[in-house]
Amino acid sequence: MFTLKKSLLLLFFLGTINLSLCEEERDADEERRDDLEERDVEVEKRFFPVIGRILNGILGK
């Protein structure tokens, strides 16, 4: 009976650690996705003014 309890306790402990690691990995993946969206916004902010200046130069002349 004691060995069964130890085995179950060990399985529970390992399962808890595994679940914790999966949650951390999922959170890290979500952060990476957020970073990509922020980079896209930064690229758009840099890209649109340049196009505006080019069109202004072409249409202004």
From Swiss-Prot:
**Propiece span(s):** 23-44
**Is Secreted given among the entry's keywords?**
yes
Entry's InterPro entries? Frog_antimicrobial_propeptide
Q: In which tissues is it expressed?
A: Expressed by the skin glands.
Q: Where in the cell is it found?
A: Secreted
Which domain of life does this protein belong to? Eukaryota
Instruction: Provide the GO biological process annotations.
Output: defense response to bacterium; innate immune response
Give the transmembrane region(s).
none
The principal location of this protein is: secreted
Which cellular component terms (GO) are annotated to the entry?
Answer: extracellular region
What's the name of the protein? Temporin-1Tg
Q: Where is the signal peptide?
A: 1-22
Q: Tell me its family.
A: Belongs to the frog skin active peptide (FSAP) family. Temporin subfamily.
Where is the PTM Leucine amide found along the chain?
L59
Key words of the record: Amidation, Amphibian defense peptide, Antibiotic, Antimicrobial, Cleavage on pair of basic residues, Immunity, Innate immunity, Secreted, Signal
